[in-house]
Structures are given as structure tokens and as C-alpha cells.
């Protein structure tokens, strides 16, 4: 992003700049629909919105989705349709399920795969606002964990009262089982870094 500036907004992260010739606001505020909805509300109060892109990680619910693959939603289940950006890079499409909890295990993912192709935690709140405001909506995600992969811990237990992930809780859990937990967390960190790079490359190449 060119000419990035940091606005004084009450969010975890916010930058204003230009991407592919368009003015953009990049914001992040933590996991879940409440925090994501608050982020979009703050943006709307401060700038004019021409389109909204919900982006980040997702969990695959079908074997056809591999780690670091780009997933573009055609629909957020229960919250309406989503548009598809133009990109020269490969991506897969399908239905996106948005729920307010981390789907931690492959066992939990299996039944969800009957109604959607991927799962995440924020898109529903963003989609509902976009449709209410008649603003074009996109949901672009990158797969951080396949349908047959489980996380090394239940990250739902690692959230603070406001819904954000607590680094202190994660570190405490890792210290209780260092021999098994730490190597798995390092693998997860490596996997998510690779996925984040793939997502960034795709977004930089896309037209919304």
C-alpha cells in the first residue's frame, strides 16, 4: 500500500493509503462478529465507503481446499451473497460459514462441511452491514488449516472477555505442555505466515 497513514481510530489496527490506484482503509479489530462489526462502523463514520472486503484466514471444510489456497466466497451463509474480484492469480470459490468461535478440530469441521466450503469468524457481521448500506461486498480468505487438520489447543479458551485472543493465556497453556504444545504452535505459526503472504499477494493483484 502506498502512502500509508495511521488515523486516530479506536481500533487494533488502521491504515489509510492507496492500493492499485484506489484509496483504501485497512482495519483489524480482533476475532468475531462483534469486533469486526465495530471496525466497519468506525470506518463508515470517518470515510466514504465504495466497497467492503472482509479478509483474513479461514478453515477449510472440504478436502479440495489446501493450506495457503485463496478462497473467495460467493455467499456468506445466512448473510447474503458476495462478489468475486478480478485477479490473474488462482483461487477457489464457494460458500463461507461465519460463526463466533474457533473450529478447533477436524471432528468439529466435518458436519459444517455439509453446508459450507470454509469457515471463519467475521464475515457475517461485515456482509450484513454492506448489504444494509447497499455497498458492494467481497469476502476473500486464505486457508490456514485444512478440513483434516486440528489446532494444538482450543483457542476459544484463549480469548479475553472482550473476545480478543490473549497472548498470556496461550503462553500459559504452552508452558503446561511444552514438549507437545510448543512444536505444534511453531508449525502453526509457520503455516499462517505462509498463508498470510499468499493472501497479501492475491489482494495486491486483485481489482474490487
List each language-model region with its residue ranges.
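Glycine-rich phosphate- or other oxyanion-binding loops that anchor nucleotides, phosphorylated ligands
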Residues: 9-208
Amino acid at each position: 500500500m502506498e502512502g500509508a497513514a495511521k488515523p486516530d481510530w479506536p481500533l487494533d489496527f488502521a491504515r489509510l493509503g492507496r492500493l492499485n490506484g484506489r484509496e483504501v482503509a485497512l482495519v483489524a479489530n480482533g476475532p468475531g462478529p462483534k469486533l469486526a462489526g465495530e471496525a466497519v462502523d468506525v470506518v463508515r463514520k470517518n470515510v466514504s465507503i465504495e466497497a467492503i472486503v472482509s479478509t483474513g484466514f479461514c478453515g477449510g471444510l472440504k478436502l479440495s481446499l489446501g493450506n495457503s489456497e485463496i478462497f473467495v466466497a460467493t455467499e456468506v451463509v445466512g448473510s447474503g451473497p458476495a462478489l468475486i474480484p478480478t485477479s490473474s492469480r488462482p483461487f477457489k470459490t464457494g460458500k463461507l460459514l461465519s460463526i463466533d468461535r474457533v473450529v478447533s478440530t477436524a471432528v468439529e469441521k466435518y458436519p459444517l462441511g455439509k453446508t459450507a466450503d470454509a469457515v471463519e469468524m467475521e464475515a457475517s457481521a461485515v456482509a450484513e452491514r454492506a448489504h444494509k448500506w447497499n455497498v458492494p461486498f467481497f469476502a476473500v480468505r486464505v486457508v490456514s488449516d485444512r478440513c483434516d487438520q486440528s489446532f494444538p489447543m482450543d483457542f476459544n479458551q484463549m480469548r479475553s472477555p472482550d473476545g480478543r485472543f490473549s497472548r498470556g493465556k496461550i503462553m500459559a497453556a504452552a508452558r503446561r505442555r511444552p514438549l507437545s504444545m510448543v512444536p505444534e504452535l511453531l508449525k502453526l505459526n509457520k503455516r499462517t505466515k505462509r498463508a498470510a503472504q499468499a493472501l497479501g499477494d492475491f489482494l495486491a493483484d486483485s481489482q474490487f
